[in-house]
C-alpha cells in the first residue's frame, strides 16, 4: 500500500537547522529535480536563474520563490545555498552567502544528502545515464516500489525529471563531468561506459578519469553492488580493480546479464535476456538501437537483484514512454508528396551520434537521414574534431549549426564552418553551414523529401528547433 506524502516526510530524516534552501541556477536540469524533491519533503525552497522558463514556472507552482536574475539579497534568508559547477564565487549570491557564513554546497552534495537515508542507486557513465535512470524508475514503479528519482531529462510518463516516491529507493544520475559523483554514497552503482569527455576536469589525463570512476565505485559499501557494462573496453579494463561485488552486462558472451536475438522494428527493439539461474526473458523497449538494449540490460540486472518479478520488468520496459530529447519523435512534418519523421536528440559526443545514426539505419534502412547538428562547446569540438568529421559524414544530408559555446570562448579551427570544410574534403557529403538555428526552416524546405527522417541533434539551443519546425508556417501550410 502506498504511503501518504506526510508519512514519507515523517520517515525521512530532516536536515537539522535547515529551513530554507536556495538554488543558484535553479532552472538547470541538474538543479530543478533536487529542488522539486526538497519542496515535496516540506522544505522552503527559493532559487534564481537568468531567465524564466517552464521549469521555473513549474517550481513556482509548487511553492518555490523564484528570482529572475542574480542579486545578493536573493540569498539573505537562506540557510544553505546549492550551486552547480558552473557557478563561481564571483556570483553575488554566493559572495553574500560566504560573507554571512551560510553554507554553500555543490548540487551533488545535496543529492548525496537526499540519498544518505535511502537505498541509493546511482547511474554513472559518459553516455546513457539519463535513459538508464529513467528505465530504472519505470521498472521499479511497475514493480510497485514507487521510487524517488532525480533524472537529467524529462521523463515523459511523469511529465517531470524528479519525483518523491513512497519507498526507500532513490534512483539518480551520477555526474562525472565535474567529478561531483564522488559525493555520492549509494548502495548500487552503474557504470555504462567511460569515454574521453569533460577532460578539462581531469587535466586532460584519461588515466585520472579512469581512477576517478574506480574511486566512485569504491564509495559503495562492501556489501553494495557495482553493475558494469563489459561491452565497453575501458570498463572491462577496470573490472579487476573493482573491490566490490559486481554484476556485468552486455552483448559479450561472458556478461552475467546479456542480450541475444536482437531485432529492431522501427521504434521498437525486441531481444531475449539471459541471466544466471533464471529462465530466458523476452522483452521489448520502445526505443531504437543497441545502445538502448544496453541501457535496458543495466536496468534488468538491478531489478533482478532487487527481486522485482519478471512480469513487472517486462511491463516497465515495454510501457516506457521515453525521455525528453532522447530520440524524441515530434511527429510527421508535411512536405511535398508526403511527410518526414521529425526527431530531436540530445547526443553531443561522436559515440552518441554514431549510436543514433546506427539506430536510424537499423529501424528505417530505406529512408534518407537528413541531419541538423549543433556541436556543443568549442573545447569538445577541438578535442574530438576528427571523430565528429567521420561520424557526421555518415548522414545523407547534413546541416551544421554554429557551435553552442556553453560559456566558452571560440577556439580557432574548432567551429562548424571549419568542420563543414573538413567533411566536404572527404568527398562523400557537401554539408551546409548554418549560423543560427532560427534560419533552418527555409533551408530545410527544398532539401526534404517524402519519407526522410529529419534528425535535429545536439546539447545546445538546437533543442528548440524541432518544436519550432513542427509549427512553422512553411511546413504547416503543406498539410492544407
UniProtKB/Swiss-Prot annotation:
Q: What class of enzyme is it?
A: ligase
> Which GO biological process categories is it annotated with?
cell division; cell wall organization; peptidoglycan biosynthetic process; regulation of cell shape
Enumerate the subcellular locations listed in this protein's record, separating them with semicolons: Cytoplasm
A single GO cellular-component term from the record reads: cytoplasm
Primary location: cytoplasm
Give the metabolic or biological pathway: Cell wall biogenesis; peptidoglycan biosynthesis
Q: Which reaction does it catalyse?
A: UDP-N-acetyl-alpha-D-muramate + L-alanine + ATP = UDP-N-acetyl-alpha-D-muramoyl-L-alanine + ADP + phosphate + H(+)
Q: Organism's domain of life?
A: Bacteria
The entry marks the following residues as binding ATP, namely 125-131
Its EC number is 6.3.2.8
Q: Which UniProt keywords apply?
A: ATP-binding, Cell cycle, Cell division, Cell shape, Cell wall biogenesis/degradation, Cytoplasm, Ligase, Nucleotide-binding, Peptidoglycan synthesis
Q: Name one GO molecular function term.
A: ATP binding
Pfam annotation, one family: Mur_ligase
State the similarity comment.
Answer: Belongs to the MurCDEF family.
Q: What does this protein do?
A: Cell wall formation.
Q: Which protein are we looking at?
A: UDP-N-acetylmuramate--L-alanine ligase
Q: Which species? A: Ectopseudomonas mendocina (strain ymp)
Amino acid at each position: 500500500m502506498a504511503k501518504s506524502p506526510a508519512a514519507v516526510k515523517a520517515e525521512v530524516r530532516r536536515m537539522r537547522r535547515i529551513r530554507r534552501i536556495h538554488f543558484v541556477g535553479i532552472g538547470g536540469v541538474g538543479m530543478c529535480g533536487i529542488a522539486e524533491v526538497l519542496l515535496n519533503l516540506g522544505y522552503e525552497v527559493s532559487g534564481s536563474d537568468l531567465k524564466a522558463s517552464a521549469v521555473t514556472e513549474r517550481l513556482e507552482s509548487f511553492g518555490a520563490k523564484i528570482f529572475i536574475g542574480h542579486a545578493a539579497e536573493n540569498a539573505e534568508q537562506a540557510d544553505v545555498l546549492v550551486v552547480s559547477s558552473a557557478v563561481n564565487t564571483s556570483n553575488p549570491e554566493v559572495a553574500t552567502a560566504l560573507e554571512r557564513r551560510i553554507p554553500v554546497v555543490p548540487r551533488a552534495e545535496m543529492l548525496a544528502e537526499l540519498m544518505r537515508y535511502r537505498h541509493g542507486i546511482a547511474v554513472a557513465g559518459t553516455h546513457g545515464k539519463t535513459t538508464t535512470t529513467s528505465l530504472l524508475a519505470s521498472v521499479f514503479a511497475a514493480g510497485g516500489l514507487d521510487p524517488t528519482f532525480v533524472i537529467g531529462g524529462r521523463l515523459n510518463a511523469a511529465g517531470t525529471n524528479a519525483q518523491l516516491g513512497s519507498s526507500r529507493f532513490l534512483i539518480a544520475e551520477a555526474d562525472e563531468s565535474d567529478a561531483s559523483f564522488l559525493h555520492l554514497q549509494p548502495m548500487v552503482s552503474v557504470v555504462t561506459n567511460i569515454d574521453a569527455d569533460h577532460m578539462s576536469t581531469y587535466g586532460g589525463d584519461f588515466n585520472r578519469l579512469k581512477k576517478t570512476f574506480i574511486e566512485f565505485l569504491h564509495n559503495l559499501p562492501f556489501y553494495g553492488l557495482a553493475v558494469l557494462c563489459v561491452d565497453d573496453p575501458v570498463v572491462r579494463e577496470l573490472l579487476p580493480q573493482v573491490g566490490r561485488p559486481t554484476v556485468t552486462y552486455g552483448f559479450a558472451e561472458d556478461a552475467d546479464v546479456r542480450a541475444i536475438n536482437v531485432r529492431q522494428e522501427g521504434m521498437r527493439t525486441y531481444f531475449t535476456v539471459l541471466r544466471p539461474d533464471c529462465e530466458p526473458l523476452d522483452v521489448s523497449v520502445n526505443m531504437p538501437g543497441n545502445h538502448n538494449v544496453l541501457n535496458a540490460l543495466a536496468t534488468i540486472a538491478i531489478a533482478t537483484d532487487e527481486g522485482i518479478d519478471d512480469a513487472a520488468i517486462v511491463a516497465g520496459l515495454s510501457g516506457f514512454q521515453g525521455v525528453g530529447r532522447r530520440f524524441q519523435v515530434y511527429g510527421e512534418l508535411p512536405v511535398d508528396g508526403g511527410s518526414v519523421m521529425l526527431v530531436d536528440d540530445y547526443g553531443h559526443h561522436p559515440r552518441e551520434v554514431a549510436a543514433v545514426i546506427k539506430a536510424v539505419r537499423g529501424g528505417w534502412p530505406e529512408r534518407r537521414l537528413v541531419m541538423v547538428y549543433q556541436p556543443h562547446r568549442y573545447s569538445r569540438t577541438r578535442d574530438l574534431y576528427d571523430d565528429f568529421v567521420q561520424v557526421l559524414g555518415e548522414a545523407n544530408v547534413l546541416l551544421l549549426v554554429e557551435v553552442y559555446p556553453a560559456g566558452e570562448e571560440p577556439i580557432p579551427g574548432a567551429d562548424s564552418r571549419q568542420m563543414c570544410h573538413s567533411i566536404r574534403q572527404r568527398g562523400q557529403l557537401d554539408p551546409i553551414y548554418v549560423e543560427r538555428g532560427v534560419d533552418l526552416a527555409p533551408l530545410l524546405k527544398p532539401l526534404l523529401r517524402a519519407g526522410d527522417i529529419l534528425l535535429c541533434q545536439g546539447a545546445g539551443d538546437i533543442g528548440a528547433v524541432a518544436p519550432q519546425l513542427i509549427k512553422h508556417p512553411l511546413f504547416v501550410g503543406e498539410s492544407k
